[in-house]
């Protein structure tokens, strides 16, 4: 994303306040770029937006600080994930890490799903 161009545009048009609401630009750091350019901005900075952008990060953070959350496992190796699912209790909720526009959650009733 070309955040610097957005900052230039906002300065040229003398925009008083930018409200950043979409996940991708928030996680990408648009708020940081706009604020660094001296533009008043409403929205979380990149280091806070990661809470929305990475469920794995969020869950790990909750676990670290004893914040109640549903049980979870993180996998980077598909074979390990499959091995886990072979012995898992169903139904089970699966979510790939990262942004999916609210559509990245699967509720599987059995291993085949």
Sequence positions of predicted segments:
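Sparse, context-dependent recognition of short Cys/His-centered cofactor- or disulfide-binding micro-motifs
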Residues: 3, 19, 47, 90-91
